[in-house]
Amino acid sequence: MDSPGYNCFVDKDKMDAAIQDLGPKELSCTELQELKQLARQGYWAQSHALRGKVYQRLIRDIPCRTVTPDASVYSDIVGKIVGKHSSSCLPLPEFVDNTQVPSYCLNARGEGAVRKILLCLANQFPDISFCPALPAVVALLLHYSIDEAECFEKACRILACNDPGRRLIDQSFLAFESSCMTFGDLVNKYCQAAHKLMVAVSEDVLQVYADWQRWLFGELPLCYFARVFDVFLVEGYKVLYRVALAILKFFHKVRAGQPLESDSVKQDIRTFVRDIAKTVSPEKLLEKAFAIRLFSRKEIQLLQMANEKALKQKGITVKQKSVSLSKRQFVHLAVHAENFRSEIVSVREMRDIWSWVPERFALCQPLLLFSSLQHGYSLARFYFQCEGHEPTLLLIKTTQKEVCGAYLSTDWSERNKFGGKLGFFGTGECFVFRLQPEVQRYEWVVIKHPELTKPPPLMAAEPTAPLSHSASSDPADRLSPFLAARHFNLPSKTESMFMAGGSDCLIVGGGGGQALYIDGDLNRGRTSHCDTFNNQPLCSENFLIAAVEAWGFQDPDTQ
């Protein structure tokens, strides 16, 4: 290999221009926490040789299946698979979904080598059905490998990781599509300004968010992608979400106020990412990414599982050749103007609310469950109409024409588990909002202030609660497992008082007050600040009710 350690697959001039080889040559650190800090700081980013050594070490330490193909396997099979075909003309495996091989700083020989390696990976991993990130991973690894066989072995170890708590790259359409939905949920929570812009300019927001992995695995320039991959190998999948969120934040900062077209926003983001050096350095991108105070890996895994479950229930497990990705029937499609009738909100307002709900439920269409004008002003009838539906949307219109409400994650039948006593239940996906006189949404306080909580110690006992709190006997059966308060150590239960219902009142939010309190006759209500949502009053603090509605979420396929 030529100095400073480039192999025969790399264009030396491009590599010199992309990465200055000025960094340290050795790494003695063995502690994971220190390694995390060094990866984030880019300790080996300026040394081609050291990055190669670090990749070798980190990938070697990935726990893998007992029989994982190594370099010798590649040497045995490559000739049979490739034959006498020119490597530049080799077809790519179907599982890359027409993703092109990013050249980065590879020469023509290197680009051909990536194709050979991908075909050999397809041969050894027949269970991979969808993996558009793999060409970028192999292309990057080839820059830092001695030869094709070593690069193949590294890729095999990443694909063969069998640590259940360590997710690397998606290898099925179900995993990929649920990650897109999860990313959409995270954007909704942590990049609300950018999400609002995407909703305004795109008819199908999930189609924009479905591109998130491409931003990282293909569009980012080498010096940026390599920095992301450095941290990814140490910290895992969560860093990918972080960086993609940071990219969207920078895109919004640059493009807010500029005209965006619905049919071009996807391409606009790709172009922005390709030219990201004009906007932000790799250091600033990672700095922004790690300034986002995301939930724990465990909570994100719960959300991913919930999204996978929703897709399975809809029969979406493989990509259909005749249609695009499972479309979030978003905004203009989910809420049909010709079919939608409400005494409280307009179609436009319902579309605004729909843009806030979790991705797995935004796939559904609104279904009117209860209307005070149709079913009467009775809380008992409200419960009867809502039971069996999860989640639900509560809408309230006051006699002063104020409009407010709540997204409620859990079936109201849960209230029956408290033996007639008033007990709180629900999850941190609940939120409250007002629409008139102005729009404002208030989410669970922990989303904005994660310092309120920390992951519970192993086998920790549940703290005693002033009010009863419900936990499902089988969390896998819950439709809304994400952000269940039982997964957190909270200083008090006032931060997790989501919803409660008795015969004489309905409450949303608690601690220091109630975000919403409605009496048993659906006649009077009150609203104030509460600890759970850290909200301002949603309307006049004491109000008379003109109308109440409850809406469910109906799968279009069941209509």
UniProtKB/Swiss-Prot annotation:
Illness: Familial infantile myoclonic epilepsy: A subtype of idiopathic epilepsy starting in early infancy and manifesting as myoclonic seizures, febrile convulsions, and tonic-clonic seizures. Developmental and epileptic encephalopathy 16: A severe autosomal recessive neurologic disorder characterized by onset of seizures in the first weeks or months of life. Seizures can be of various types, are unresponsive to medication, last for long periods of time, and occur frequently. Affected infants show psychomotor regression or lack of psychomotor development, as well as other neurologic features such as extrapyramidal signs and hypotonia. Most die in childhood.
Record's bilayer topology term: Peripheral membrane protein
Resulting phenotype, residue 110 to S: In DOORS; uncertain significance
InterPro entries per record: Rab-GAP-TBC_dom, Rab-GAP_TBC_sf, TLDc_dom
Compartments, record wording: Cell membrane; Cytoplasm; Cytoplasmic vesicle membrane; Presynapse
Protein name: TBC1 domain family member 24
Task of the protein: May act as a GTPase-activating protein for Rab family protein(s). Involved in neuronal projections development, probably through a negative modulation of ARF6 function. Involved in the regulation of synaptic vesicle trafficking.
Positions that bind a 1,2-diacyl-sn-glycero-3-phospho-(1D-myo-inositol): 36, 40, 238, 242, 293-297
Tissue-specificity statement: Highest expression in brain.
Outcome reported for the amino acid change (mutating residue 251 to L): In FIME; fails to induce neurite overgrowth when overexpressed in primary cortical neurons
Lineage: Eukaryota, Metazoa, Chordata, Craniata, Vertebrata
